[in-house]
């Protein structure tokens, strides 16, 4: 899990080790509670353009100006018509959610250019709040990949 910031972020990053430890502890406890086989790791805050997505099978960036590709379509294209592997199968998927003001078009273009596995996706007709978009996207992924 990358904690990134971009041009339109209202809150600027704080490099506090205690927060990083807390976030990793929360991720571990949540994974244990939900019966996940793999525990997500939370990394330090970094600029979106500095994030390295090379180790991921797919990278989906939720972009409010994406009009053609939904998350479902991008998943099918990335992993075939059959549903992708479940947690046990080991697909590594990165999701990128924008800040309160949305992404700058150049930020989206940079991620798509620098990450071969990246795809810009729509989460629907409505623009969601940052905190809602992340949960909505994770719920969509769970539904599509885990049935």
Where on the chain are the PLM-derived regions?
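RNA substrate-binding interface of SAM-dependent RNA methyltransferases
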Residues: 2-61
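Short glycine/serine/threonine-biased micro-segments
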Residues: 33, 96-100, 122, 132
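Short beta-strand/loop segments at the ligand-binding rim of alpha/beta enzyme cores
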Residues: 36-39, 90-94
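A mid-sequence, solvent-exposed acidic-amphipathic segment
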Residues: 44-87, 93-96
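Short Gly/Pro-enriched loop/turn and capping motifs at secondary-structure junctions
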Residues: 66-68, 100-104, 127-128
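A C-terminal functional module that forms or caps the active site or interfaces directly
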Residues: 92-112
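Structured adenosyl-cofactor binding patch, chiefly the S-adenosyl-L-methionine
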Residues: 105-147
């Amino acid at each position: 899990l990358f904690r990134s910031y971009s041009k339109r972020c209202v809150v600027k990053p704080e490099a506090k080790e205690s927060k990083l430890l807390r976030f990793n502890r929360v991720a571990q406890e949540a994974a244990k509670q939900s019966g996940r086989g793999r525990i997500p790791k939370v990394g330090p805050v970094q600029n979106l353009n500095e994030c390295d997505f090379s180790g991921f099978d797919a990278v989906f960036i939720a972009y409010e100006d994406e009009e053609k590709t939904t998350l479902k379509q991008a998943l099918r294209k990335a992993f075939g018509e059959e549903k992708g592997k479940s947690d046990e199968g080991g697909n590594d998927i990165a999701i990128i959610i924008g800040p309160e003001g949305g992404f700058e078009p150049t930020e989206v273009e940079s991620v798509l250019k620098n990450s071969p596995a990246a795809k810009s996706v729509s989460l629907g007709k409505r623009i969601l709040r940052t905190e809602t978009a992340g949960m909505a996207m994770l719920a969509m992924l769970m539904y599509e990949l885990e049935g």
